[in-house]
């Protein structure tokens, strides 16, 4: 196992996982465990959410609650499969009472996300919702208006194409967001080429 220190935490370069971190006292207090990204380490598409919720904190995987079910369903609808994409979060620990992660907390976790993306070398990074979009792009984002658009973002020492997408939870509260969500996922699959991964054409 290859581990090294990253800004106060410990990073496992083989598993692409944060194995220890206590940089954010409030998150250390509220979390049950660190929730790392899941999916292939050579995925063409990397989805970045906001932070773990209650289900994710309990199970130790991102997007396993209702939002994750919506994401899985829509991925299948556009010819993708969860097993062939990487899913991770801006912040790896559950914020108390499911609040948005503070700016400092996002910055504390940025080095982990940068290393994860750099190791995977995806064709495209897709930000799910306002928090990850604004964090990676460094500006205010109108998610609904900009959904499906691609911008360049410097993450760590490298620059990656980033596509803005509405958060799957938004489709639960506002069904009118559903079409934009589906079309953005379809555009992401097309951008990555041949359904995002060579195996995805079977779905």
Predicted regions located by residue number:
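A polyanion-binding, active-site-adjacent surface
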Residues: 2-203
């Amino acid at each position: 196992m290859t581990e090294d220190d990253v800004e106060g935490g410990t990073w496992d370069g083989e598993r692409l996982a944060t194995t220890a971190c206590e940089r954010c006292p409030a998150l250390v207090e509220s979390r049950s465990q660190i929730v790392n990204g899941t999916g292939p380490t050579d995925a063409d598409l990397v989805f970045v959410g906001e932070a773990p919720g209650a289900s994710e904190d309990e199970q130790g995987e991102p997007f396993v609650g209702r939002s994750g079910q919506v994401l899985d369903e829509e991925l299948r609808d556009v010819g993708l499969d969860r097993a062939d994409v990487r899913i991770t979060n801006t912040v790896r620990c559950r914020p108390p009472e499911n609040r948005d992660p503070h700016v400092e907390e996002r910055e504390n976790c940025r080095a982990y996300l940068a290393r994860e993306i750099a190791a995977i070398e995806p064709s495209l990074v897709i930000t799910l919702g306002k928090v990850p979009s604004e964090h990676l792009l460094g500006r205010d984002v109108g998610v609904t208006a900009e959904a499906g658009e691609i911008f360049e973002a410097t993450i760590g020492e490298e620059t990656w194409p980033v596509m803005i997408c509405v958060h799957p939870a938004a489709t639960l509260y506002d069904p009118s967001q559903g079409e934009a969500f589906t079309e953005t996922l379809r555009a992401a699959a097309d951008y990555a080429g041949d359904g995002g991964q060579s195996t995805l054409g079977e779905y």
